[in-house]
Amino acid sequence: MSEGKSPAKKRARRSLSISKTKKNECNSIISFFNNVPPAKLACPICSKMVPRYDLNWHLDEKCANNDNITPVDLRHVGFTDSSGSTVNLTNTVLENVTPGKLSPSKASLTPDPSDSAKMGIKQQTSPYFKNNKDLVFKNQDKLRHHNVKVITLGSLSSKLSRRYTEARRSICKKNEEFASKSPQSPSSTVVRSPVDNCSEIEDKDQILENSSQKENVFTCDSLNEQRTEHSVEDTKVLEAESQEATQECGRSPLTPAFSDNAFVLFSPDLTRGNPLRSTSEDSLEWETITGIDGKDVEKCEAGSCEEVKVTVASEAKTQLSDWEAKCHSSTPDDSKGCNIQDLLLEGDSDLKNEITCRIPLEQGSSCDVPDKTVTVPPSHPYYLRSFLVVLKAVFENEEDRMLFDEHEKEIVTKFYQLSASAQKLYVRLFQRKFSWLKMNKLEYEEIAPDLTPVIGELQQAGFLQTESELQELSEVLELLSAPELKTLAKTFHLVNPNGQKQQLVDTFLKLAKQPSVCTWGKNQPGIGAVILKRAKGLAGQALRVCKGPRAVFSRVLLLFSLTDSLEDEEAACGGQGQLSTVLLVNLGRMEFPRYTINRKTQIFQDRDDLIRYAAAAHMLSDISTAMANGNWKEANELSQCAKSDWNKLKSHPSLRYHENLPLFLRCFTVGWIYTRILSRTVEILQRLHMYEEAVKELESLLSQRVYCPDSRGRWWDRLALNLHQHLKRLEPAIKCITEGLADPEVRTGHRLSLYQRALRLRESPSCQKYRHLFHQLPEVTVGDVKHVTITGRLCPQRGMGKSVFVMEAGGPTAPATVLCSVEEVALAYYRRSGFDQGIHGEGSTFSTLYGLLLWDIIFMDGIPDVFRNAYQASPLDLCTDSFFASRGPAIEARLQRIHSAPAESLRAWVAAAWQAQEGRVASIVSWDRFASLQQAQDLVSCLGGPVLSGVCRRLAADFRHCRGGLPDLVVWNSQSRHFKLVEVKGPNDRLSHKQMLWLDELQKLGADVEVCHVVAVGAKSKSLT
């Protein structure tokens, strides 16, 4: 090296200068623009050309819902010749074939993708998936004495080199010559292997480097993830026995049965070395297992599948001999083409066992052949299957079926009589917001390329209405887009035609109300009619689901999900949440606890009762939406309308029946819903600073005890605040506090809040003349706990919100600065204090332990009406007093055992419940709260029986009011088993009344509790240095 000599093995450097002596001139810049990535890529499932960036969406929404593609095993699929016979590949093994060395990146049997432009603009199918050419094996003898060696793709620099480009072009040229020389059969079927697709994709390196759809492209390296070289030696070709088909599979006009023109496609999962999974929405898992006798058996795992026996009969000898003849007649160069195709069946035995093909197969068709079964998934997409499950569940129950009249039952019957495409489209439209939709904006290719006949069928059946029935100007204006509204505004010469959409809509509505200037001609249309006509002309064809059938299906969904939270009953969502739950359960991704459904009490007396409840539930949903959006005036108008409707219903006879229902069923009555609306009205009036009206509403709510008794504490507390703070009425405020403390429904935090307000009023100088009113107050005492103070660096931030702290992390060698919450600052402090374990879970930590220790009691049988459907995460009476009352002896016995149990027993009980119920959806259990079962067992060992039994008793007695306020942190030392329960308070934060009560209760149970105050260091306005 000192003499300036290069090393012997050093590769000669390539000059970077452009020299005239070079053999190959640099390509023109035009070639760069000619080789840009294509705008569309071929879908690996259905072979359609789709936009590059829509490939994921296409696979999820269209290919996955293609009913005509059914996964079956390759060894059950026969290649078909022109005579209609098929080759049975089930027991065919290609042996004694050792393909020669060949890199999959430098061989392809398909034309260059750039040639697709020459085939015409109208082409919508990738040339790689054309099924009009057959694969020809030529030179079988050559194949028997060669090894296949899969070479890795190499570095990026080698792929970009000119030498690599030249070699690739020469290989493509040879492949084109091979394709032109090979005889083709017009009736043959092309079978594409993943290796072929790898070659095609490699010819578009630029696509791989620039596209965002890399996960949908086959990769050659994944074929040989564990090994880089595969070879098969000393094998023999066995001839398969042929047999005649005993029965021909039935055909369907929509889903053709297995035939000679059925194309075969491979899933991308093959190239990743994974077992093939169906891309349909059925989530079926297909496995191939070999029995004792060597025969392959197909196993389908799914919630519900139909098995169809399909005969795969063929003349294997004739077809196989044809292949051998073609391979023997091929040239040596052409043998490479056979090698690529043979890699699929011969290169790797493990890969061969995972191959699954797709053929169109009609559901329900069958051909009787022994030991040959193919499981066909349900033909409907997931949303239609879930919708049908809901309909079946409701109308199979006599109590629910009686809530619909004959006309409504006929509507459901008509829906069942619709075609599959019409049912799919209706469910899609039903799940969308209830409004008019432009027909040219609807695009559901998985349903039908042209939706016009499907829409016509739905319109004729009475499920859809078209623009001919669109007569409301406000609805037409909402249908128009912003550019269309501006065009319409210019037509009518509005003052500000380029304004916002809502401003233009309001202007048009005001203009339509103006009287016409022309006084002659009474038959002349007014300005509103003219605007309506012009607007409908701009909107074009439109449609909307009819209100009548939609209301019927909405009530069906309401009955099906009656036990769900009423906040989820969004009128505009079309039951999306309920259908999603059904889907997840059917797919096995969601599982509810095991319990016995026991429905004894009828909630709704008749159809009108259900309709009133549904109307009130939708009104509550509309008011909640307006409040969430900050539209307080609109929310006030809606609440006043609801109040008027409720006043008309107060004398209805059905309300007396509702009053006698158990409390946990009374919440599904119309009176309960309107009471919740009036409670929301109080908040709306307070937001609008209408405190006088708010006080009247609160007094009206407190005057009844039938509905929402669990909210009485909040109502009393709010009434006292309005009278004391906002209206300055001291004597009524004191009387309110006295009555509130005497109310047995006022509990925990609200009771303490009222008592503390009374103490403040008693000490106030302005209340000296009312001190005699405080003599009858019941005393509420709460003990204090230990307080500690730590400091933390506050992150500079603007506006409101939780405080964010800056904390140093990492070791001395790799220091780092992280942003964290106030609870994480406290956890770091206690970690330095010797507590090696800690959880920030607030109430979910203790409710999870409560659910694990009392799981069998919470979901026990024998209690009527607490479990009314199969999708409940908790019993209906969990948050009522009847929960403890109906399970009193069992709960008392369990609490006694927990109180006196040693640590080993507690660990065993938690482990038994965890292992038996893990993953099931239960509202009180958060399975991700603990990192593992071991951590949960360690915590119960540290807490001990007395603390656990005391917490469980309080939660079981009044879960509604006691589930909140538990300490933020639980920290413990895994060696000494010392634990501490900590409530963390950041800057400008203080303890709530519920937190005070829980800290006092836990301290009485013997737990080490304390309040950790985190004081900020630094000002929010200052920046970090």
Swiss-Prot record:
Recorded GO CC terms: nucleus
Annotated catalysed reactions: Hydrolytically removes 5'-nucleotides successively from the 3'-hydroxy termini of 3'-hydroxy-terminated oligonucleotides
Positions of Mn(2+) 1 binding: 968, 983-984
Gene3D superfamilies named among the record's database cross-references: 3.40.1350.10
Domain VRR-NUC: from-to ranges: 903-1015
Binding site for Zn(2+): 43, 46, 58, 63
Notes concerning its domains: The UBZ4-type zinc finger specifically binds monoubiquitinated FANCD2. The KEN box and D-box are required for interaction with FZR1/CDH1 and essential for APC(CDH1)-mediated ubiquitination.
General function of this protein: Nuclease required for the repair of DNA interstrand cross-links (ICL) recruited at sites of DNA damage by monoubiquitinated FANCD2. Specifically involved in repair of ICL-induced DNA breaks by being required for efficient homologous recombination, probably in the resolution of homologous recombination intermediates. Not involved in DNA double-strand breaks resection. Acts as a 5'-3' exonuclease that anchors at a cut end of DNA and cleaves DNA successively at every third nucleotide, allowing to excise an ICL from one strand through flanking incisions.
Name of the protein described by the UniProt record: Fanconi-associated nuclease 1
